[in-house]
């Protein structure tokens, strides 16, 4: 795995690449195009594989839930944009993606994967890296899975909501926090309000 330039609390590495957009068109996009919004950037190993379509379809199907909280979801792999489009145009029953509601970025030169530190160099593919970037472009969360295990859309959505809550209210979110549940005031005395209710 490459070391990369992606660090929690620092600006996420910007990139420019060709993506297949939800309307099926090719477009050059940059991460900086999304400033002012949260971004979930997730990498997957390859098109036309087995775990990947389950993740991509799950994120695409729930993309509106992310948009409602000012967050965009972007998928990326080392495949060409032509390969992405062919996969999108392949029926789901044949292992394809079908219609997409999120852009899929092409990283054929592996520049983005290297910059984000998730390139599996011996195979030239990406690990399952997932990055949550806030509305100022700061990297807030990194998860990297080995190839055989997919990621949870529910957990990703929860994490975005938690970071947005802490940004807005200045309180912190305990383990397993869900929107609407109790948070903790980051103060020795005031935190006791939370702990006295949760033994």
UniProtKB/Swiss-Prot annotation:
Modified how: The enzyme can be inactivated by further oxidation of the cysteine sulfenic acid (C(P)-SOH) to sulphinic acid (C(P)-SO2H) instead of its condensation to a disulfide bond. It can be reactivated by forming a transient disulfide bond with sulfiredoxin SRXN1, which reduces the cysteine sulfinic acid in an ATP- and Mg-dependent manner.
Annotated InterPro entries: AhpC/TSA, Peroxiredoxin, Peroxiredoxin_AhpC-typ, Peroxiredoxin_C, Thioredoxin-like_sf, Thioredoxin_domain
Domain named Thioredoxin: residues: 6-165
Keywords per UniProt: Antioxidant, Cytoplasm, Disulfide bond, Oxidoreductase, Peroxidase, Redox-active center
EC class name: oxidoreductase
Pfam families: 1-cysPrx_C, AhpC-TSA
UniProt subcellular location: Cytoplasm
GO molecular function list: thioredoxin peroxidase activity
Main location per the UniProt record: cytoplasm
SUPFAM superfamilies named in the record: Thioredoxin-like
EC id: 1.11.1.24
GO cellular component, one term: cytosol
CDD domains for this protein: PRX_Typ2cys (cd03015)
Top-level taxon in the UniProt lineage: Eukaryota
GO biological process, one term: hydrogen peroxide catabolic process
Record family assignment: Belongs to the peroxiredoxin family. AhpC/Prx1 subfamily.
Misc. remarks from the entry: The active site is a conserved redox-active cysteine residue, the peroxidatic cysteine (C(P)), which makes the nucleophilic attack on the peroxide substrate. The peroxide oxidizes the C(P)-SH to cysteine sulfenic acid (C(P)-SOH), which then reacts with another cysteine residue, the resolving cysteine (C(R)), to form a disulfide bridge. The disulfide is subsequently reduced by an appropriate electron donor to complete the catalytic cycle. In this typical 2-Cys peroxiredoxin, C(R) is provided by the other dimeric subunit to form an intersubunit disulfide.
Function noted in UniProt: Thiol-specific peroxidase that catalyzes the reduction of hydrogen peroxide and organic hydroperoxides to water and alcohols, respectively. Plays a role in cell protection against oxidative stress by detoxifying peroxides and as sensor of hydrogen peroxide-mediated signaling events. Might participate in the signaling cascades of growth factors and tumor necrosis factor-alpha by regulating the intracellular concentrations of H(2)O(2). Reduces an intramolecular disulfide bond in GDPD5 that gates the ability to GDPD5 to drive postmitotic motor neuron differentiation.
Subunit architecture: Homodimer; disulfide-linked, upon oxidation. 5 homodimers assemble to form a ring-like decamer. Interacts with GDPD5; forms a mixed-disulfide with GDPD5. Interacts with SESN1 and SESN2. Interacts with FAM107A.
Protein name: Peroxiredoxin-1
Lineage of the organism: Eukaryota, Metazoa, Chordata, Craniata, Vertebrata
Gene: PRDX1
